[in-house]
């Protein structure tokens, strides 16, 4: 079986291309080139990707260090949080893919080991990255495992994400080794690519993530009822996206206008979308490499 090990330069290129792709498509409620969100400049998302890439691919940093320095330097230049969720989701993948693996299944096994090892690393760096990034709605939570309270430092990172995984999809991804990506998003995107353009497939993927779970950002910022309502609306929209035409494009545009009017931003679904695009690109490269080898 062929071994794979992606260079840091290739991983940086793949990461940036995924961030750029995602910002160009219509993601209802979320920022895009053609539909900016009030107070958010899409060019800053480009810049956030460029800044964070330098620290994410740094071989001298472990997962915690890369996350912390990526967030810290993005905030230093941009002044606010533009990509905490993406950094949290992407960093373990890039660290794993930069080491030897022999298949996508093996990549997932080693990703699990990488995530489990975080507990023995300097997890306070990840906690600090989340604190300084101050993600939307995080101050609305006051229960056990509140990362914004210094009194919760007695909990290790694994214990904290176990608590938050009940409502936060990024924490859940850390707990179950990205099951939602590998077992839901990737197969859905793979099938979409067979039928539709890449642009429309990415838009469908974003709506799909909205439809299968409550968006963590909306849940934190508002409440469970609001998050469920948005997810229900996304399911109805997804049912209309079985063809790629002006009608479906109009459906997405109108849904985008509605969510932005209501100030409902499914930001976590955007993070899941970028992560899926990266793993999909890695999968494609591995598949092509195996074909050439055979």
Regions found by a protein language model. Give the residues of each.
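Residue-level detector of well-ordered alpha-helical segments, enriched
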Residues: 66, 85-89, 126, 198-205, ...
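Generic recognition of cysteine residues
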Residues: 18-19, 64, 71-74, 184, ...
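Conserved phosphate/anionic-ligand binding catalytic regions in large, soluble enzymes, centered on
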Residues: 78-92, 262-277
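Phosphate-rich cofactor/ligand-interacting catalytic cores and adjacent structured alpha/beta frameworks
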Residues: 1-61, 98-257, 261-263, 280-294
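Long, hydrophobic/aromatic-enriched structural stretches that serve as scaffold segments
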Residues: 53-103
């Amino acid at each position: 079986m062929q071994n794979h090990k992606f260079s840091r330069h290739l991983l940086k290129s793949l990461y940036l291309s995924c961030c750029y792709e995602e910002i160009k498509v219509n993601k209802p409620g979320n920022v895009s080139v053609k539909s900016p969100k009030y107070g958010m400049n899409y060019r800053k998302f480009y810049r956030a990707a460029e800044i964070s890439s330098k620290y994410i691919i740094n071989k001298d940093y472990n997962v915690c260090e890369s996350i912390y320095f990526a967030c810290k330097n993005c905030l230093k230049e941009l002044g606010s949080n533009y990509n905490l969720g993406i950094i949290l989701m992407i960093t373990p993948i890039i660290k794993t893919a930069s080491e030897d693996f022999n298949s996508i299944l093996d990549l997932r096994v080693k990703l699990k080991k990488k995530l489990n090892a975080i507990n023995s690393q300097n997890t306070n760096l990840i906690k600090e990255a989340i604190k300084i990034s101050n993600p939307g709605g995080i101050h609305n939570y006051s229960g056990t495992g509140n990362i914004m309270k210094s009194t919760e430092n007695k909990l290790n990172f694994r214990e904290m994400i176990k608590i938050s995984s009940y409502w936060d999809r990024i924490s859940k991804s850390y707990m179950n080794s990205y099951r939602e990506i590998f077992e839901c998003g990737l197969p859905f995107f793979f099938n979409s690519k067979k039928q539709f353009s890449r642009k429309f497939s990415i838009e469908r993927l974003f709506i799909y993530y909205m439809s299968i779970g409550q968006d963590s950002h909306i849940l934190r910022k508002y409440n469970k009822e609001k998050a469920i309502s948005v997810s229900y609306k996304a399911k109805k929209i997804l049912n209309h996206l079985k063809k790629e035409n002006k009608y479906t494009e109009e459906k997405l545009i109108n849904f985008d206008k509605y969510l932005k009017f209501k100030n409902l931003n499914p930001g976590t679904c955007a993070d899941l979308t970028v992560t899926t695009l990266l793993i999909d690109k890695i999968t494609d490269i591995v598949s092509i490499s195996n074909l050439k080898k055979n």
